[in-house]
């Protein structure tokens, strides 16, 4: 099933955290306070045509209580607002698209500025 986020939202498939330590101790869910991570599966047109700070395939970090859970074709996803994304894992900046001659310089600058606040 295809899903197109609206507004400034992204569709994310969660990456599950390890439930055991290297020595085999099981970590209860309530003891985990780390941000969650996931892979971006779809971005809204407003993001893909605007600031382009997040794209499909990016691994992102987001807060534990952010977003809305949905199930599509038996797979659980999160729909997140752009502002709820804490950062892109493995990226030096939100300008990782390499598109430095884009037409939306003001929007891109504002988007990068917003992400630096986090």
From Swiss-Prot:
UniProt main location, coarse: cytoplasm
GO biological process per UniProt: chaperone cofactor-dependent protein refolding
Source taxon at top rank: Bacteria
UniProt xrefs under SMART domains: Cpn10
Subcellular location: Cytoplasm
GO molecular function: ATP binding; metal ion binding; protein folding chaperone; protein-folding chaperone binding; unfolded protein binding
InterPro entries the record matches: Chaperonin_GroES, Chaperonin_GroES_sf, Chaprnonin_Cpn10_CS, GroES-like_sf
Entry's Gene Ontology cellular component terms: cytoplasm
Record flagged with keyword rRNA processing: no
UniProt keyword list: Chaperone, Cytoplasm
UniProt keyword Cytoplasm present: yes
Subunit structure: Heptamer of 7 subunits arranged in a ring. Interacts with the chaperonin GroEL.
Function: Together with the chaperonin GroEL, plays an essential role in assisting protein folding. The GroEL-GroES system forms a nano-cage that allows encapsulation of the non-native substrate proteins and provides a physical environment optimized to promote and accelerate protein folding. GroES binds to the apical surface of the GroEL ring, thereby capping the opening of the GroEL channel.
Family per similarity comment: Belongs to the GroES chaperonin family.
Record-linked HAMAP family: CH10
Protein name: Co-chaperonin GroES
Species, as recorded: Helicobacter pylori (strain P12)
Gene responsible for this protein: groES
